[in-house]
Amino acid sequence: MEKFKAAMLLGSVGDALGYGNICRENSVLGSIQEELQKTGGLDSLVLSPGRWPVSDNTIMHMATAEALTTDYWCLDDLYREMVKRYVETVETLSEHRPDPSTIEGCSQLKPDNYLLAWHTPFSEKGSGFGAATKAMCIGMRYWKPERLETLIEVSIECGRMTHNHPTGFLGSLCTALFASYALQGKPLVQWGREMLKVLPLAEEYCRKTIRHMAEYQEHWFYFEAKWQFYLEERKIREDAEDKVTFPDNYDAEERDKTYKKWSSEGRGGRRGHDAPMIAYDALLASGSNWTELCQRAMFHGGESGATGTIAGCLFGLLHGLATVPRGLYQELEHKGRLEDLGAALHRLSTEEK
């Protein structure tokens, strides 16, 4: 149970740090690195809600987790619950610098329409990171290998509610799968290629449930190709390849260049394929070193709130809170609620439903 709580907490810690990084980038306060040097580094930092608020990444992840921990009878009821919570949540997001795709996607949801509540049209603008950052808890709820089919369906439908574009909703499948792999104890180096093996099952599900699959097809291959390229770059694409390879020079400046290269628009982590990719890359490089993870996933020149949310949550599932300074989570915004959701997800994941 402790790792479930840690995952919910550290996802939000990663969000607060990454979101704070973006806010400070765009202000006269100076960079987050300068601020940390003055205050004594991450060990001395206290994330208080006033100075280090969370963004919409945390708020939407909590909304997903809250829906997953209700007493729903069937998946359609779960989807109606998600729709209701997303629509209620999005009305409160204006001060949280929300992902525009999330706002637009929620505007298409119909909580009062019993049959069509979560059915939204294909969206060219739905490729953003917001589907990926709200789906780790789905992998926590359905982490067992025998629940893979449910994980695929729920993560895709959850993603499509707000990001009905393969680059968007395959991001939610990806982060849900990664969370399940962490809890299964699957070696980290295998996660990317195991995720690619699941994509045909996801495509099969979409063919059965999406009426006009043709407009999705081209974008589908984009997500897959980007991940294949990444895994080949790190030399972990094939089953026999279990040693990750990084460039000799991979400092902050080089990482920013690489993150931009992986993106589709020059801002690392902006889309559903590269937000999980940057988080995964950071986890591969950092091991159990929390400070190193922050340097790679929370403090970069792209969408560091999104990548920080994903990386923090997965780190919690892998390593718990042992190496994380207490100041980062003891006063964290929504701390009690996050811990309660982690406990509820743990309890429900051990029961059959």
Swiss-Prot record:
Pfam families: ADP_ribosyl_GH. The keyword Coiled coil does not apply. One of its GO terms (biological process) is protein de-ADP-ribosylation. Expressed in the embryonic heart at E11.5. Keywords: Cytoplasm, Phosphoprotein. GO terms for cellular component: sarcomere. It comes from the Eukaryota. InterPro entries: ADP-ribosylarg_hydro, ADP-ribosylglycohydrolase, Ribosyl_crysJ1, Ribosyl_crysJ1_sf. Gene3D superfamilies: ADP-ribosylation/Crystallin J1. The modification Phosphoserine is found at residue 27. Required for myofibril assembly and outgrowth of the cardiac chambers in the developing heart. Appears to be catalytically inactive, showing no activity against O-acetyl-ADP-ribose. Belongs to the ADP-ribosylglycohydrolase family. This is Inactive ADP-ribosyltransferase ARH2. It comes from Mus musculus (Mouse). The gene is Adprhl1.
